């Protein structure tokens, strides 16, 4: 009985070790599951994100989205109301960001024009500045959707896995800016 228990524990440890090693590809790139935890920076709120290769641009749950002018430039004011996974509390923050661009989203429900802003999120131990459309996702399970543009910056997607990385960013974590990252050549607006 004791030998069986030791063998079972050894097998479980071996499986968990191989799982941890599966987080990087042979080329050393990170491998993410189709659902991951992320932290919205610098706010520090931990959220669930769906990694979706069917979407081009990432999307963030936002309400009260208003485009306005500041010093001759287009800006966007919006509110993010979400549950912080770290505390279990509902939290709310209003942001004002320069409008990066605008997109036309086509789907089964018709067409929708949305502003795009740059937001920072922590994935694993790295902070990424990424493009996000702003949309009311309150009827969705995940407040953050990461599309192909962001996925191409992160690494690989394993659709059979979830929660392969936990956000562990600090003030000294590497920051990858949108302007410094190359977009995949076959993704287009």
Stretches found by the model and what they are:
Residues 7-16:
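Bacterial N-terminal signal peptides
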Residues 20-189:
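Pepsin/retropepsin-fold aspartyl endopeptidases
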Residues 1-7:
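Bacterial N-terminal signal peptides that target proteins for export
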